[in-house]
Amino acid sequence: MPRKHTYLNVYQTGKLTVVSFVSAEHLDQIIVSECRAEIAELIKQHACEVLAFDLTGVKLVPSGMLGMLASLGRLGVQVLVYNPSDEIREVLEITRLDSLLQVQHVEV
């Protein structure tokens, strides 16, 4: 039976794993350490090499969550960010996180 994820919707698994956040409008309520543990388990379980976060509809990403996304490279995966809002894209550029997190627009 597939594992129920607390924080993530998992759309695709394998070398490219695509996820979104269960509660896209309430990312500020996520416990970052628990979310990171869930992501680490997902990476290991599916031998993930590229992890893509679909941010479609997300309006705000708390700084702790941005730090967590940036730190995922230490787990040996490339991190992609799909469809960030203009505001989130601007924050990624200002903080230079766009050099660690590859930003892409994809059709959903």
Ranges and model annotations:
Residues 25-101:
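Amphipathic alpha-helical interaction surfaces in cytosolic regulatory modules
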Residues 2-37:
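STAS-typified acidic loop motif
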Residues 100-108:
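Short acidic-hydrophobic, aromatic-tinged amphipathic segments that line or gate anion-handling sites
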Residues 15, 86, 108:
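Residues that form or immediately flank small-molecule/cofactor binding pockets and catalytic motifs
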